Amino acid sequence: AAGAMRGYGIPQAMWAGESHLDDVAKALGRNPVEYRRQVVMPVGYRDEFSKNENYFDTFNQVMDKGMEAIGYQEKWEAYQHQTGPVRRGVGMALFWYNTAVWPISLESSSCRMVLNQDGSIQVQTGETEIGQGCDTAYAQMAADAVGIPFEDVHIVSTQDTDITPFGLGAYASRQTYIGGFSIRQTGQMLKERILTYAVELTRQTRANLDLIDGKIVRVSDG
């Protein structure tokens, strides 16, 4: 069964929905893949409940890649005229899973960054590493936002609520997306503070300074 860590019951519901879609396509005499292409959300579709908008043609892209990977079309054509008690089949199932739980509930995350004397940073966030690799993703995001090497980012992976910033939890495919935004915003604030101080030391304009790979550089000549 799909619990809170595996899709919130979506696989069960989609099994029924996609099976029904196959039955409808068969009743209409339609190719099941082409019928799906007709009814999936097109580019520009806006969901009135979540207010999310589909900006990319990813449904058709994943169908194309999946069909190519398993040789779908060749198998589908070969299996059309089988006889006997044992037969082979090939199918297509497609669904969209939302990230996080908005607008059902408010989403938020928090982050704290500390700059060490050696130029490395410590990052604390309320989101929990439970084996899905989010600490690695957070370190990459923090490094990119601040402008330092990945190796100089230390994630404090101890979600003790006495000392850790607030976070809503590890569920609903939310951590990288929601937690990542708080890390990005905090990293940009830290970077701005570093460069503002660098302006005082170098007498350069703020627009001519950037933080790249852990070094403060002049934008004009690198």
Predicted regions and their residues:
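Short acidic, glycine/serine/threonine-rich loops at helix termini
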Residues: 47-50, 104, 133-136, 164-170, ...
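Helix-loop-helix junctions that connect adjacent transmembrane helices in secondary transporters/permeases
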Residues: 39-120
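Alpha-helical support elements that line or immediately flank enzyme active sites
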Residues: 4-39, 61, 65, 100, ...
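Substrate-binding beta-hairpin/strand module that engages nucleic acids
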Residues: 151-165
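A glycine-rich phosphate-binding loop feature that marks nucleotide/adenosyl-phosphate handling sites
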Residues: 37-44, 79-95, 157-161, 198-221
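Short intrinsically disordered, low-complexity coil segments enriched in acidic
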Residues: 1-4, 222
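Short, surface-exposed charged micro-motifs
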Residues: 110-114, 145, 208-210
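A short small-residue
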Residues: 1-2, 43-45, 163-174
